[in-house]
Amino acid sequence: MSSSQSPSTPSASLVDSSDSKHPDDLPQIYKRRSVWTSSEDAVSSSNSPEQTTPFTVREDTNADIARELDLPDDPEPHLVRRSSAPMVDEAGTSNWQDASEPLMPTVKIEDFLYFGPNETEDILRLNEQKAFEKAEKKKRKKKKKAVMPNPPGSSMCTEQSLSDLKARFGLGAVTLRVPSPEERADSPPAGFYTLYEGFFYGCLLWLPIPRLVLEYVTSYQIALSQITMRSLRHLLGILIRSYESETEITLAHLRNFLEIRRVPKSEVDRYYISPAKGKKIIDGFPSKDEPYTDHFFFVAIEDAIHEDLLGTVLTRWGILERTLKFLEPIPDDFLSAFHALSARKCDWLKHFSRERVECALRLLHGVSCPTSSESSDHRTQFFVDMQSTKLTLREVYAKKKEDKERRLAEERRLVNTGLISPRADPEATQDGNVIPDATAPQTAPEASRDGVNPYTAGPVDAAPAEAQGAEPSAAAPEAVLALPAIDKAAGKRIRVDDVSSKKKKKKKKASGSEVEKILPIFEDRTASANLLGGCVGPLLPPPDTLLESRKYAETASHFLRAVASMNRMVHSYDSAMRSNMEVAGKLAEAESRIQAIEREKNEALSEAAAAKLEKEEVERTAHVNKENAIKMAEQNLKANSEIVRLKRMLSEARGLRDSEVARAVQTTRREVSETFIAKMKNAEHKVSLLDEVNDRFMYLSQARANAQLIEALEGGGVLESEKEQVDEWLKDFADAEVNLNRFMSELKDDLKAPAPEPAPLSPGGHRSVESLADEAGITDQAGSLLPAKDNRPSEDLD
């Protein structure tokens, strides 16, 4: 045994895997839990006890682990399994060197590999670290600097971009022009129309621009280049859905389906279109569109717009003209059209593509949609041709008729060349004289012995050559032919779906005489010879007595076969002519009905046009009347407000006049009262001085009385008599002082004038509350503290 295979070899031990070059990344081998199974050669391995039993880890497993841990793809060395752990003193020499190996079967590892918890955490940590590094690299990438047009407002389109646009969308015959740096999108040159590259790449627009789209934007007096990409997606999506569902929509439908508004915070007159409330048809638009306004170009107006719209479509930008919503006409089929358009999925990002647009336009113009195997690189070159005219019902049927005739002619050519077998006519199949019965071979065995197959018949044209080329409708039956009877009856019976036909067939087969009656005469050569021999009278002896009776019978049979072929040809021609006459009669009847329907349609259209004109006239009259009523109401409102204002002004003038009169009277009264009060105060002052004067006068009177008393006493008067006289006077004038004081007080009271009390005037000078509120800036006086209307003072004119 070699040292490499010895169980004591350290490099081959179970614990040596920890000595790998990547001790941190590669887990130890005992942590790998594997499923081990015995191999088929376990018996052979048991016969060699001296051989070790290696356990080899599969290279694909090692490669998977190395790939996850970013290790080299070198496989691990072979591992040798031991029956027990090594001894402690194994570092020197092995104690198992001379020991015999146990009998262990060779096993192999399965494809199931399990990782320990630490190994799984390491793998997750490494994956997270790699993802983090990738994210950091993306963040470190510099953002592309936005390229702006120079000068601002000019176009960034180039000849190369327009050439790519032409090549991608099949606009080879359309005249496209790159704007100059001085030209702007809102004012294209004469004879040109402004469009954006984003309208084609992001909105799937085609040329010429759909008529209904132009009518919609023109009805608001704006240009197509003034609406956003999402707005155009709404319009084109509704048109495509109408083509697919065969729903006819008009401008009135679009104006009721959609609403248009000005883009907020926009420096130019740009507008966006959104669905009306509860009328969403197209959904799933991109959350944000790429900048498209800088990539505008000019297209020749005759290539972009239909001829009948050249004088009405606006090329320069305009301002939105909005009408009242309740004045918009609502079509009769508005709800049904909405349900038909919204019946199918209408997610723009998921369900709309250039292929769907092409298929919808093909359906519109009666062209079959291409299969999925056809290349989608053949773009919309046919749009220009198909947009010009739409096939009428007669043209569609005529086209179908031409296709059928071409197909029948091709089939006849293949039949004549022998590439295909002709088809049997149903009428010829039902005729017993054309196709022999299956029992015919049993009735004429001698013909078969002669080497002539009597059941073979070639194809017979349904009509002469001149009849076939005369009219396509007359050549509807392709070929009336007699199939070989042996082909029909060999090895199978004829299947008939009709039960009555089966019963008749059985009855015919029941009796041999009836079978012989339905056979053609040329199948019986004796009968054919007798028939032709009797045509010339008694000059010809009986055919059976002729020397060449057999050849004569054969010739007569062939002759009658030719006559039968001629009869079949005449019969088929006659039946074809009869069917053609019936078809012609039905066609004439259909033509008459179509003409009647056309007349009714024209009458209905004329009535509808008259009704429409009448409706428009009524609407115009109603609109005018409504405008007049509105104007009259506004004038009445203005007149009423003017009357109220004049009444208020008159009331204010009255109040001002009354206040001025009251103020003048008050001023006069104040002046008079002031003068009177001054005089009264002067009189009062003098009256106050009257007391002093009165006292002095009393003193003077007393002095005079004393003087008179002294003089009387000196003159010889008696004191007692004088005293009595004085007492009598005191009694007579006892109330004189009281009366004097009362008189003086009454006089003072009468002379005292009250202070003037001026009547307070309003701060506004008798002005109305409404005028004061108007001056204060109050526009709405509802809910104010005004008195009730019934309690307000009357402001009627005198």
From Swiss-Prot:
Location of the region described as Disordered in the Swiss-Prot/TrEMBL record: 1-99, 135-158, 417-473, 749-798
UniProtKB keywords: Chloroplast, Coiled coil, Phosphoprotein, Plastid, Transit peptide
Biased composition range(s): Low complexity: 1-13, 462-473
Coiled coil: 578-658
Transit peptide location on this chain: 1-58
One CC-aspect GO term: chloroplast
Transmembrane annotation, as ranges: none
Biased composition (Polar residues): 35-55
Major site of localization recorded for this protein: plastid
Subcellular location: Plastid, Chloroplast
Biased composition (Basic and acidic residues): 57-79, 789-798
Superkingdom in the source lineage: Eukaryota
Compositional bias per record (Basic residues), positions renumbered to this chain: 137-146
Sites bearing Phosphoserine, chain numbering: S762
Annotated protein name in UniProt: Uncharacterized protein At3g60930, chloroplastic
